[in-house]
Amino acid sequence: MSNSNSGKVRVAVVYGGRSSEHSVSCVSAGAIMAHLDPEKYDVIPVGITVDGAWVVGETDPQKLTLIDRTMPEVEHHEEVRPSLDPAHRGEFHFSDGSLYATADVIFPVLHGRFGEDGTVQGLFALSDIPVVGPGVLASAAGMDKEYTKKLMAAEGLPVGREVILRDRTELTEAEKNLLGLPVFVKPARGGSSIGISRVTAWEDFNKAVGLARAHDEKVIVESEIVGSEVECGVLQYPDGRIVASVPALLSGTESGAGGFYDFDTKYLDNVVTAEIPAPLDEKTTELIQSLAVESFQALACEGLARVDFFVTANGPVLNEINTMPGFTPISMYPQMFTASGVAYEELLDVLVQQALHRDN
């Protein structure tokens, strides 16, 4: 599979990006680079700065870690460009046209817009280079909460109530009655709980819409769902098998400043705990795993996804799907598969091999 002199597969780890999840992407990339088997893989780091410049990436994974609550960023180095020509697939060139490196496969560790939303997947599809994770359609649909829910609902999967705001800031009285209080106001295309507000009084609604709209012109307003927060990973093997991890139960998510699982609570404050496997009865566990796989298939995902649920008194309700979940040391996706018997290094190996063996 490799044309490298070492005989190893060359993996371009692309990270950073223009989204508000830039720093999380950097930490995920550092963990991935540290865990890719050096006997099988050569890592080619490619960073994308917050203003969108593609640059030679950091070679030391330790520099892409969370240190004293300080999140890393891609620094400006010598710029590189990916080739879009299938005759030169996998090549990255410096500004003067000279070759930086040639990759056999791309691992786009990009969270949020301009990376997890199908844009980068489409870019690399132009040159026929294998890419880890879902393709253009699944990535775009998974990034947009409106269309995620529409596709899930069309497949008969359980989703909550929501209203979409495109060019308005107010809800009608009928919509307020439909949703009730509290509601969550979110950017329709975002992640890591950035730009999200929990609204308990309608007089605070406009401010919440303004915050969400700072990250996305389209806003989704969701009814609060009372239940336990449970996550489940999905992994596709090179032979096409799709498996679900043991689920994880999150506790302490309400301790964020806004009363929910916000960015600081996820990555900085160290107050959320996860029970893996989740202490659920066998029937509920199997149902969550089944729904996770069905969600993966409903969006035509490939490779991987993390599916988030609320487990209510009436059963599980799908919250969202992440087509490139976090790979940080505290991220649920690798932890859930480790608890399922798939170690971090093996997980990465499966993902890279799945990308190389699929029909691109």
Curated annotation (Swiss-Prot):
Keywords: ATP-binding, Cell shape, Cell wall biogenesis/degradation, Cytoplasm, Ligase, Magnesium, Manganese, Metal-binding, Nucleotide-binding, Peptidoglycan synthesis. Its main location: cytoplasm. It catalyses: 2 D-alanine + ATP = D-alanyl-D-alanine + ADP + phosphate + H(+). It comes from the Bacteria. It is found in: Cytoplasm. Binds 2 magnesium or manganese ions per subunit. Its EC number is 6.3.2.4. Gene3D superfamilies: 3.40.50.20, ATP-grasp fold, A domain, ATP-grasp fold, B domain. Pathway: Cell wall biogenesis; peptidoglycan biosynthesis. The keyword S-adenosyl-L-methionine does not apply. Mg(2+) 2 binds at E320, N322. Residues 149-353 form the ATP-grasp domain. Mg(2+) 1 binds at D308, E320. GO terms for cellular component: cytosol. ATP binds at residues 176-231. One of its GO terms (molecular function) is ATP binding. Cell wall formation. Belongs to the D-alanine--D-alanine ligase family. This is D-alanine--D-alanine ligase. It comes from Corynebacterium glutamicum (strain ATCC 13032 / DSM 20300 / JCM 1318 / BCRC 11384 / CCUG 27702 / LMG 3730 / NBRC 12168 / NCIMB 10025 / NRRL B-2784 / 534).
